Amino acid sequence: MAPKAEKKPAAKKPAEEEPAAEKAEKAPAGKKPKAEKRLPAGKGEKGSGEGKKAGRKKGKKSVETYKIYIFKVLKQVHPDIGISSKAMSIMNSFINDIFEKLAAEAAKLARYNKKPTITSREIQTAVRLVLPGELAKHAVSEGTKAVTKFTSS
């Protein structure tokens, strides 16, 4: 901060070197609050100097949720019923939890069978192992239907 204060008086009176040095010693005491006020502007200048980094949105990562899909299924099943944000958050957490369990089980199955790839067969077996009874049967049939629809289109 002090070099900035020395440059200003020197620029005004280049012929007088000694008085400029004396003024430079006196100037920092009076100009320090101004320099401190300039710090946020200085940060902005640094930000503009790093235009690429400051221009990009650094903060928020995209968080993938199932909220849209939960809402669509709710409207298919019960068109007249709504859902609170807390209930939606619980449902989203539930689906994430089930997805993680299925993925972990499918990965274990692939490792046991010494296969490098998780296929629909591992997913189907994981569903049968993770989900209980009738729920597993319905999930397998819906999954098979979805896969055949996807491959046919």
Swiss-Prot record:
Gene3D superfamilies: Histone, subunit A (1.10.20.10). InterPro entries: Histone-fold (IPR009072), Histone_H2A/H2B/H3 (IPR007125), Histone_H2B (IPR000558), HISTONE_H2B_site (IPR055333). The modification N6-acetyllysine is found at residues 7, 37. Residues 1-28, 36-53 have a biased composition (Basic and acidic residues). GO terms for molecular function: DNA binding; protein heterodimerization activity; structural constituent of chromatin. Its main location: nucleus. GO terms for cellular component: nucleosome; nucleus. It comes from the Eukaryota. There is a cross-link at residue 149 (Glycyl lysine isopeptide (Lys-Gly) (interchain with G-Cter in ubiquitin)). It is found in: Nucleus; Chromosome. Can be acetylated to form H2BK6ac and H2BK33ac. Transmembrane segments: none annotated. Keywords: Acetylation, Chromosome, DNA-binding, Isopeptide bond, Nucleosome core, Nucleus, Ubl conjugation. Residues 1-60 are annotated as: Disordered. Core component of nucleosome. Nucleosomes wrap and compact DNA into chromatin, limiting DNA accessibility to the cellular machineries which require DNA as a template. Histones thereby play a central role in transcription regulation, DNA repair, DNA replication and chromosomal stability. DNA accessibility is regulated via a complex set of post-translational modifications of histones, also called histone code, and nucleosome remodeling. Belongs to the histone H2B family. The nucleosome is a histone octamer containing two molecules each of H2A, H2B, H3 and H4 assembled in one H3-H4 heterotetramer and two H2A-H2B heterodimers. The octamer wraps approximately 147 bp of DNA. This is Histone H2B.6. The lineage of its organism: Eukaryota, Viridiplantae, Streptophyta, Embryophyta, Tracheophyta.
